[in-house]
Protein backbone atom coordinates (compact mmCIF):
# COMPACT_ATOMS: atom_id res chain seq x y z
CA UNK A 1 0.00 0.00 0.00
CA UNK A 2 1.48 3.34 -1.03
CA UNK A 3 1.11 6.52 0.95
CA UNK A 4 -0.30 9.53 -0.84
CA UNK A 5 0.50 13.05 0.29
CA UNK A 6 -2.79 14.89 0.31
CA UNK A 7 -2.43 18.63 0.39
CA UNK A 8 -5.14 21.24 0.27
CA UNK A 9 -5.74 23.28 -2.84
CA UNK A 10 -5.18 27.06 -2.71
CA UNK A 11 -6.99 29.44 -5.01
CA UNK A 12 -7.17 33.20 -5.35
CA UNK A 13 -10.64 34.72 -5.35
CA UNK A 14 -10.33 38.22 -6.83
CA UNK A 15 -9.15 40.99 -7.05
CA UNK A 16 -10.97 41.06 -10.41
CA UNK A 17 -13.73 38.67 -9.47
CA UNK A 18 -17.26 39.90 -10.31
CA UNK A 19 -18.63 38.71 -6.96
CA UNK A 20 -15.82 40.31 -4.94
CA UNK A 21 -17.60 43.70 -4.69
CA UNK A 22 -14.61 45.83 -5.45
CA UNK A 23 -10.95 45.07 -4.95
CA UNK A 24 -11.05 42.19 -2.49
CA UNK A 25 -8.52 39.39 -2.72
CA UNK A 26 -9.37 36.21 -0.85
CA UNK A 27 -6.87 33.38 -0.63
CA UNK A 28 -8.98 30.26 -0.17
CA UNK A 29 -7.69 26.92 1.07
CA UNK A 30 -9.95 24.16 -0.21
CA UNK A 31 -10.32 20.51 0.65
CA UNK A 32 -12.18 19.34 -2.42
CA UNK A 33 -15.18 21.67 -2.49
CA UNK A 34 -15.09 22.47 1.26
CA UNK A 35 -13.50 25.72 2.40
CA UNK A 36 -10.85 25.12 5.06
CA UNK A 37 -9.52 28.66 5.41
CA UNK A 38 -10.27 32.13 4.06
CA UNK A 39 -7.58 34.77 4.10
CA UNK A 40 -8.77 38.26 3.06
CA UNK A 41 -6.07 40.51 1.61
CA UNK A 42 -7.14 44.12 1.87
CA UNK A 43 -5.50 47.47 1.23
CA UNK A 44 -5.81 47.55 -2.55
CA UNK A 45 -7.95 50.70 -2.28
CA UNK A 46 -6.04 52.32 0.57
CA UNK A 47 -5.82 56.08 0.04
CA UNK A 48 -4.59 57.30 3.42
CA UNK A 49 -7.83 59.14 4.19
CA UNK A 50 -7.17 59.55 7.92
CA UNK A 51 -3.76 61.08 7.29
CA UNK A 52 -5.04 63.38 4.55
CA UNK A 53 -7.75 64.73 6.86
CA UNK A 54 -5.05 65.92 9.28
CA UNK A 55 -3.74 68.31 6.61
CA UNK A 56 -7.12 69.89 5.81
CA UNK A 57 -9.37 72.32 7.67
CA UNK A 58 -12.51 70.96 9.30
CA UNK A 59 -14.66 72.01 6.35
CA UNK A 60 -12.25 70.68 3.72
CA UNK A 61 -12.30 67.26 5.39
CA UNK A 62 -16.00 66.73 4.62
CA UNK A 63 -15.62 65.43 1.01
CA UNK A 64 -13.28 62.64 2.18
CA UNK A 65 -16.21 61.03 3.97
CA UNK A 66 -18.24 60.74 0.76
CA UNK A 67 -15.53 58.56 -0.68
CA UNK A 68 -15.60 55.93 2.06
CA UNK A 69 -18.86 54.04 1.70
CA UNK A 70 -19.62 55.52 -1.70
CA UNK A 71 -23.04 53.89 -2.08
CA UNK A 72 -24.50 55.95 0.80
CA UNK A 73 -22.29 59.04 0.99
CA UNK A 74 -24.28 61.38 3.24
CA UNK A 75 -24.43 58.95 6.16
CA UNK A 76 -20.67 59.25 6.64
CA UNK A 77 -20.64 63.05 6.45
CA UNK A 78 -23.33 62.93 9.11
CA UNK A 79 -21.09 61.16 11.63
CA UNK A 80 -18.24 63.61 11.01
CA UNK A 81 -20.53 66.63 11.30
CA UNK A 82 -21.91 65.30 14.60
CA UNK A 83 -18.37 64.88 15.96
CA UNK A 84 -17.32 68.42 15.04
CA UNK A 85 -20.58 69.84 16.42
CA UNK A 86 -20.03 68.01 19.71
CA UNK A 87 -16.61 69.65 20.07
CA UNK A 88 -17.98 73.07 19.08
CA UNK A 89 -21.04 72.65 21.29
CA UNK A 90 -23.50 73.93 18.68
CA UNK A 91 -27.15 73.00 18.18
CA UNK A 92 -28.72 72.34 14.79
CA UNK A 93 -32.17 73.86 14.10
CA UNK A 94 -35.01 71.38 13.63
CA UNK A 95 -35.29 71.99 9.88
CA UNK A 96 -31.62 71.11 9.42
CA UNK A 97 -32.06 67.98 11.54
CA UNK A 98 -35.04 66.82 9.47
CA UNK A 99 -33.17 67.37 6.19
CA UNK A 100 -30.23 65.36 7.54
CA UNK A 101 -32.43 62.49 8.69
CA UNK A 102 -34.35 62.51 5.40
CA UNK A 103 -31.16 62.17 3.38
CA UNK A 104 -29.66 59.62 5.79
CA UNK A 105 -32.66 57.39 5.16
CA UNK A 106 -32.35 57.93 1.41
CA UNK A 107 -28.75 56.74 1.78
CA UNK A 108 -29.92 53.69 3.73
CA UNK A 109 -32.31 52.74 0.92
CA UNK A 110 -29.57 53.34 -1.69
CA UNK A 111 -27.24 50.99 0.17
CA UNK A 112 -29.78 48.27 0.97
CA UNK A 113 -31.15 48.26 -2.59
CA UNK A 114 -27.68 47.76 -3.99
CA UNK A 115 -26.86 45.06 -1.45
CA UNK A 116 -30.06 43.02 -1.65
CA UNK A 117 -30.07 43.00 -5.44
CA UNK A 118 -26.37 42.22 -5.86
CA UNK A 119 -26.65 39.51 -3.19
CA UNK A 120 -29.35 38.00 -5.40
CA UNK A 121 -27.09 38.39 -8.44
CA UNK A 122 -24.24 36.61 -6.62
CA UNK A 123 -26.43 33.53 -6.32
CA UNK A 124 -27.71 33.75 -9.88
CA UNK A 125 -30.81 36.00 -9.99
CA UNK A 126 -30.27 38.55 -12.74
CA UNK A 127 -33.52 40.56 -12.65
CA UNK A 128 -33.45 42.29 -9.20
CA UNK A 129 -30.38 44.47 -9.91
CA UNK A 130 -32.14 45.97 -12.93
CA UNK A 131 -35.20 46.85 -10.84
CA UNK A 132 -33.12 48.05 -7.93
CA UNK A 133 -30.99 50.37 -10.04
CA UNK A 134 -34.11 51.90 -11.56
CA UNK A 135 -35.16 53.06 -8.07
CA UNK A 136 -31.61 54.04 -7.10
CA UNK A 137 -31.50 56.28 -10.16
CA UNK A 138 -34.48 58.28 -8.85
CA UNK A 139 -32.81 58.64 -5.45
CA UNK A 140 -29.56 59.77 -7.09
CA UNK A 141 -31.57 62.54 -8.76
CA UNK A 142 -32.78 63.66 -5.29
CA UNK A 143 -29.16 63.76 -4.16
CA UNK A 144 -28.30 65.82 -7.21
CA UNK A 145 -31.16 68.26 -6.68
CA UNK A 146 -30.08 68.86 -3.09
CA UNK A 147 -26.33 69.12 -3.52
CA UNK A 148 -25.53 69.31 -7.24
CA UNK A 149 -23.81 65.94 -7.26
CA UNK A 150 -25.13 62.40 -7.62
CA UNK A 151 -22.55 60.75 -5.40
CA UNK A 152 -20.05 62.97 -3.65
CA UNK A 153 -22.47 65.42 -2.15
CA UNK A 154 -20.52 67.30 0.56
CA UNK A 155 -23.98 68.42 1.66
CA UNK A 156 -24.05 67.64 5.39
CA UNK A 157 -21.51 70.02 6.90
CA UNK A 158 -20.60 70.89 10.48
CA UNK A 159 -23.28 73.36 11.54
CA UNK A 160 -26.14 72.01 9.45
CA UNK A 161 -26.57 71.41 5.74
CA UNK A 162 -25.09 73.34 2.85
CA UNK A 163 -28.29 74.68 1.27
CA UNK A 164 -32.00 74.61 1.96
CA UNK A 165 -34.24 72.16 0.11
CA UNK A 166 -36.76 73.67 -2.32
CA UNK A 167 -40.37 72.89 -1.42
CA UNK A 168 -40.92 71.11 -4.74
CA UNK A 169 -38.06 68.70 -4.03
CA UNK A 170 -39.53 67.77 -0.64
CA UNK A 171 -42.89 67.11 -2.31
CA UNK A 172 -41.25 64.99 -5.01
CA UNK A 173 -39.50 62.87 -2.36
CA UNK A 174 -42.89 62.40 -0.68
CA UNK A 175 -44.45 61.37 -4.00
CA UNK A 176 -41.66 58.84 -4.60
CA UNK A 177 -42.36 56.86 -1.41
CA UNK A 178 -45.51 54.89 -2.27
CA UNK A 179 -44.57 53.77 -5.82
CA UNK A 180 -41.24 52.61 -4.37
CA UNK A 181 -43.02 50.30 -1.92
CA UNK A 182 -44.71 48.66 -4.93
CA UNK A 183 -41.34 48.17 -6.62
CA UNK A 184 -40.04 46.69 -3.36
CA UNK A 185 -42.97 44.25 -3.34
CA UNK A 186 -41.90 43.07 -6.81
CA UNK A 187 -38.36 42.30 -5.59
CA UNK A 188 -39.86 40.72 -2.47
CA UNK A 189 -42.15 38.44 -4.49
CA UNK A 190 -39.30 37.40 -6.75
CA UNK A 191 -36.79 36.52 -4.01
CA UNK A 192 -38.28 35.94 -0.57
CA UNK A 193 -40.14 32.73 -1.36
CA UNK A 194 -37.84 31.63 -4.16
CA UNK A 195 -36.68 28.06 -3.63
CA UNK A 196 -33.23 28.52 -5.17
CA UNK A 197 -32.60 31.79 -3.32
CA UNK A 198 -33.55 30.15 -0.02
CA UNK A 199 -31.40 27.08 -0.66
CA UNK A 200 -28.40 29.33 -1.26
CA UNK A 201 -28.97 31.53 1.82
CA UNK A 202 -30.81 29.70 4.62
CA UNK A 203 -28.39 28.32 7.26
CA UNK A 204 -25.38 29.73 5.39
CA UNK A 205 -23.02 32.04 7.28
CA UNK A 206 -24.68 31.53 10.67
CA UNK A 207 -23.32 33.73 13.47
CA UNK A 208 -24.53 33.45 17.06
CA UNK A 209 -25.14 36.62 19.07
CA UNK A 210 -22.14 35.98 21.35
CA UNK A 211 -19.90 35.66 18.30
CA UNK A 212 -21.37 38.87 16.88
CA UNK A 213 -20.30 40.86 19.94
CA UNK A 214 -16.92 39.11 20.06
CA UNK A 215 -16.15 39.99 16.42
CA UNK A 216 -17.26 43.61 16.86
CA UNK A 217 -20.23 43.39 14.50
CA UNK A 218 -22.83 46.14 14.31
CA UNK A 219 -25.89 47.06 12.29
CA UNK A 220 -27.71 44.40 10.29
CA UNK A 221 -25.15 41.74 11.26
CA UNK A 222 -26.09 42.02 14.96
CA UNK A 223 -29.81 42.44 14.35
CA UNK A 224 -29.82 39.32 12.17
CA UNK A 225 -28.64 37.34 15.19
CA UNK A 226 -31.40 38.63 17.43
CA UNK A 227 -30.20 41.80 19.17
CA UNK A 228 -32.36 44.91 18.76
CA UNK A 229 -29.30 47.15 18.66
CA UNK A 230 -29.81 50.21 16.47
CA UNK A 231 -28.09 53.49 17.31
CA UNK A 232 -31.13 55.41 16.07
CA UNK A 233 -33.00 53.88 19.03
CA UNK A 234 -30.36 53.02 21.61
CA UNK A 235 -28.35 56.27 21.34
CA UNK A 236 -30.69 58.63 19.48
CA UNK A 237 -29.10 61.52 17.58
CA UNK A 238 -30.73 64.39 15.66
CA UNK A 239 -34.52 64.01 15.82
CA UNK A 240 -34.75 60.21 15.66
CA UNK A 241 -36.26 60.10 19.16
CA UNK A 242 -39.34 61.99 17.83
CA UNK A 243 -39.89 59.65 14.87
CA UNK A 244 -41.81 56.39 14.77
CA UNK A 245 -40.16 53.32 13.26
CA UNK A 246 -39.64 49.66 14.08
CA UNK A 247 -36.39 47.73 14.32
CA UNK A 248 -36.55 44.29 12.67
CA UNK A 249 -34.52 41.50 14.24
CA UNK A 250 -33.77 37.99 13.00
CA UNK A 251 -33.51 34.77 14.95
CA UNK A 252 -31.19 32.49 12.96
CA UNK A 253 -28.32 34.87 12.19
CA UNK A 254 -27.92 33.50 8.66
CA UNK A 255 -27.71 35.14 5.23
CA UNK A 256 -31.45 34.84 4.70
CA UNK A 257 -32.32 36.63 7.95
CA UNK A 258 -29.98 39.46 7.05
CA UNK A 259 -31.62 39.74 3.64
CA UNK A 260 -35.09 39.90 5.24
CA UNK A 261 -33.96 42.56 7.72
CA UNK A 262 -32.62 44.76 4.92
CA UNK A 263 -35.93 44.41 3.07
CA UNK A 264 -37.92 45.44 6.16
CA UNK A 265 -35.50 48.27 6.96
CA UNK A 266 -36.16 49.80 3.54
CA UNK A 267 -39.87 49.93 4.39
CA UNK A 268 -39.08 51.49 7.77
CA UNK A 269 -36.84 54.06 6.06
CA UNK A 270 -39.73 55.03 3.80
CA UNK A 271 -41.86 55.42 6.93
CA UNK A 272 -39.26 57.77 8.46
CA UNK A 273 -38.96 59.70 5.18
CA UNK A 274 -42.72 60.27 5.07
CA UNK A 275 -42.66 61.69 8.60
CA UNK A 276 -39.76 64.00 7.70
CA UNK A 277 -41.49 65.17 4.51
CA UNK A 278 -44.71 65.91 6.41
CA UNK A 279 -42.86 68.00 8.97
CA UNK A 280 -40.74 69.79 6.36
CA UNK A 281 -43.98 70.82 4.64
CA UNK A 282 -45.84 71.79 7.84
CA UNK A 283 -44.31 72.92 11.16
CA UNK A 284 -40.69 73.05 9.90
CA UNK A 285 -41.53 74.62 6.53
CA UNK A 286 -39.55 77.77 7.26
CA UNK A 287 -36.75 78.62 9.63
CA UNK A 288 -32.98 78.19 9.61
CA UNK A 289 -31.55 74.97 8.18
CA UNK A 290 -28.08 75.44 9.66
CA UNK A 291 -26.72 76.78 12.92
CA UNK A 292 -26.97 80.55 13.37
CA UNK A 293 -23.47 80.57 14.86
CA UNK A 294 -21.70 82.87 12.40
CA UNK A 295 -18.30 81.58 13.50
CA UNK A 296 -18.92 78.21 11.84
CA UNK A 297 -21.49 78.65 9.07
CA UNK A 298 -20.49 81.06 6.29
CA UNK A 299 -22.78 84.03 5.54
CA UNK A 300 -25.32 83.92 2.71
CA UNK A 301 -24.51 85.27 -0.77
CA UNK A 302 -27.06 88.08 -0.48
CA UNK A 303 -25.50 89.27 2.76
CA UNK A 304 -22.03 89.27 1.21
CA UNK A 305 -23.22 91.63 -1.53
CA UNK A 306 -24.38 94.13 1.09
CA UNK A 307 -21.84 93.89 3.88
CA UNK A 308 -18.06 94.08 3.73
CA UNK A 309 -17.78 92.27 7.09
CA UNK A 310 -19.73 89.30 5.72
CA UNK A 311 -17.36 89.11 2.74
CA UNK A 312 -14.30 89.15 5.02
CA UNK A 313 -15.93 86.55 7.23
CA UNK A 314 -16.70 84.30 4.26
CA UNK A 315 -13.12 84.59 3.02
CA UNK A 316 -11.70 83.72 6.46
CA UNK A 317 -13.99 80.71 6.88
CA UNK A 318 -13.05 79.24 3.51
CA UNK A 319 -9.31 79.92 3.69
CA UNK A 320 -8.29 79.54 7.32
CA UNK A 321 -11.41 77.81 8.61
CA UNK A 322 -12.82 77.94 12.13
CA UNK A 323 -10.86 76.87 15.20
CA UNK A 324 -12.32 73.99 17.16
CA UNK A 325 -11.78 73.88 20.95
CA UNK A 326 -9.20 71.30 22.06
CA UNK A 327 -10.62 67.97 23.16
CA UNK A 328 -11.54 64.53 21.92
CA UNK A 329 -14.92 63.13 20.99
CA UNK A 330 -16.48 60.02 19.46
CA UNK A 331 -19.65 60.33 17.41
CA UNK A 332 -21.37 57.41 15.71
CA UNK A 333 -24.34 57.04 13.41
CA UNK A 334 -26.28 53.97 12.33
CA UNK A 335 -24.97 53.80 8.77
CA UNK A 336 -26.58 51.27 6.40
CA UNK A 337 -23.74 48.81 6.99
CA UNK A 338 -23.50 49.19 10.78
CA UNK A 339 -22.06 51.60 13.32
CA UNK A 340 -20.01 54.22 11.51
CA UNK A 341 -18.00 56.16 14.09
CA UNK A 342 -15.64 59.11 13.97
CA UNK A 343 -13.14 59.63 16.79
CA UNK A 344 -11.92 63.20 16.51
CA UNK A 345 -9.04 64.73 18.45
CA UNK A 346 -8.67 68.50 18.29
CA UNK A 347 -5.65 70.48 19.47
CA UNK A 348 -7.46 73.81 19.26
CA UNK A 349 -6.25 74.66 15.74
CA UNK A 350 -8.19 74.84 12.48
CA UNK A 351 -7.25 71.28 11.46
CA UNK A 352 -8.04 67.96 13.17
CA UNK A 353 -5.07 66.58 15.13
CA UNK A 354 -6.32 63.02 14.51
CA UNK A 355 -9.43 61.61 12.92
CA UNK A 356 -10.00 57.89 13.40
CA UNK A 357 -12.69 56.38 11.22
CA UNK A 358 -14.48 53.29 12.53
CA UNK A 359 -15.86 51.57 9.45
CA UNK A 360 -18.40 48.79 10.05
CA UNK A 361 -17.40 46.77 6.97
CA UNK A 362 -13.86 46.36 8.30
CA UNK A 363 -15.03 44.39 11.35
CA UNK A 364 -17.40 42.31 9.22
CA UNK A 365 -14.75 41.34 6.68
CA UNK A 366 -12.47 40.11 9.49
CA UNK A 367 -14.96 37.35 10.20
CA UNK A 368 -14.96 35.93 6.64
CA UNK A 369 -12.73 33.05 7.74
CA UNK A 370 -14.91 32.33 10.79
CA UNK A 371 -18.14 32.40 8.78
CA UNK A 372 -17.05 30.45 5.68
CA UNK A 373 -15.16 27.60 7.31
CA UNK A 374 -16.78 24.26 6.51
CA UNK A 375 -19.04 25.70 3.82
CA UNK A 376 -18.89 25.00 0.09
CA UNK A 377 -16.81 27.16 -2.24
CA UNK A 378 -19.99 28.54 -3.83
CA UNK A 379 -21.17 29.80 -0.44
CA UNK A 380 -18.20 32.17 -0.11
CA UNK A 381 -19.82 34.54 -2.62
CA UNK A 382 -23.17 34.30 -0.82
CA UNK A 383 -21.63 35.09 2.58
CA UNK A 384 -19.63 37.95 1.14
CA UNK A 385 -22.80 39.36 -0.42
CA UNK A 386 -24.69 39.27 2.87
CA UNK A 387 -21.88 41.03 4.77
CA UNK A 388 -22.51 44.13 2.62
CA UNK A 389 -18.93 45.22 2.06
CA UNK A 390 -17.80 48.33 0.25
CA UNK A 391 -14.08 48.73 -0.14
CA UNK A 392 -13.88 52.47 0.18
CA UNK A 393 -14.56 52.19 3.90
CA UNK A 394 -12.67 48.94 4.53
CA UNK A 395 -9.38 50.23 3.12
CA UNK A 396 -9.93 53.93 3.87
UniProtKB/Swiss-Prot annotation:
It comes from the Bacteria. It catalyses: a quinone + NADH + 5 H(+)(in) = a quinol + NAD(+) + 4 H(+)(out). One of its GO terms (molecular function) is NADH:ubiquinone reductase (non-electrogenic) activity. Coiled coil: none annotated. InterPro entries: NADH_Q_OxRdtase_suD, NADH_UbQ_OxRdtase_49kDa_CS, NDH1_su_D/H, NiFe-Hase_large. The gene is nuoD. This is NADH-quinone oxidoreductase subunit D. The keyword Metal-binding does not apply. It comes from Rhizobium leguminosarum bv. trifolii (strain WSM2304).
Amino acid sequence: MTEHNVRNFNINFGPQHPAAHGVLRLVLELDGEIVERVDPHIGLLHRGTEKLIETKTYLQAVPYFDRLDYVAPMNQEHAYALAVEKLLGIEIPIRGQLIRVLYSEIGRILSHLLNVTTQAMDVGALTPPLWGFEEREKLMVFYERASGSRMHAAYVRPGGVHQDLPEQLVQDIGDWCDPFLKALDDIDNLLTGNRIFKQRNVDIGVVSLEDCWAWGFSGVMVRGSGAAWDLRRSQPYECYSDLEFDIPIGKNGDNYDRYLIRMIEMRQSVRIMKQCVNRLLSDAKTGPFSSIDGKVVPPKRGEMKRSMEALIHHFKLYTEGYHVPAGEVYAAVEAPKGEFGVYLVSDGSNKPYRCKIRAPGYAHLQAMDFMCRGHQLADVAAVLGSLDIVFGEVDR
